[in-house]
Amino acid sequence: NMDGLEYKRTKFNKWVQKFVFWEERMAVKHSHYLIADNMGIRDYYKEKYGKESKFLAYGADVHEDYDVDVLKEYGLGAGGYFIVVARLEPENNLFMAIEGYLASNQYGKHPLVVVGKTNTPYGKYLMERYGRDRNIRFVGGIYDFRKLNSIRHYSYAYFHGHSVGGTNPSLLEAMASGCFILAHDNIFNRAVLGENALYYGSTDAATEMLDGIDQAVSAHKKEYTERNLEVIRRDYSWEKLVDEHEEYFKWMLSQRKGG
């Protein structure tokens, strides 16, 4: 399973990136079969290496047991905040989301809640730069899944800035939690969300998107969230995906045994 474009992760220095890219080439060359968790990743390996891969995604469960009282712990109100849940690394585009928010008409109206450990080098940088702003709230990692799903569910909108592929589990969880999603514009996110999200590719685009977010929420939130929930139930249920993995593994074994 090839995961994402690991060599593009900016937490690695240039030498490590080159080594990881070499690992990618060796994996493609020497593996009998490749698995891609995202159609964008599958297309990448086809175009770059001429190698086919099997699309087998991750999954998520649709939840119904949300607890609005969880918000009190963070001083939040239902529908009254933006949220981003991510590892605080450059390739997840926290800077783009935060700077876009700061320049928008939503700054001071709805706080931006950042969920993720701040003890990474980039997390420390973000804390130093933005941590004193009362409208940007770094709450650390949240590992109580029910609590995290509730905080996602009651958000006004959810930023998803991941950019190096493939299918990020936190995106599926946001969809399964009924979030109105604001996604970084790349092939991996579009492969999952299709037209059921708003997209931004720069700080200015994020600002423009947020300046019109109230109208977008009124016009599209119900439609987009319902469609995303249907996508999770149809394409990303664990029962379906476990069956697909089992079938593919059986097929691989049959090939190794000569059919």
Predicted feature descriptions by range:
Residues 16-33:
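Membrane-proximal helix-turn-helix segments that form the acceptor-binding/catalytic region
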Residues 124-146:
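Nucleotide-activated donor-binding/catalytic signature segment of Leloir-type glycosyltransferases, i.e.
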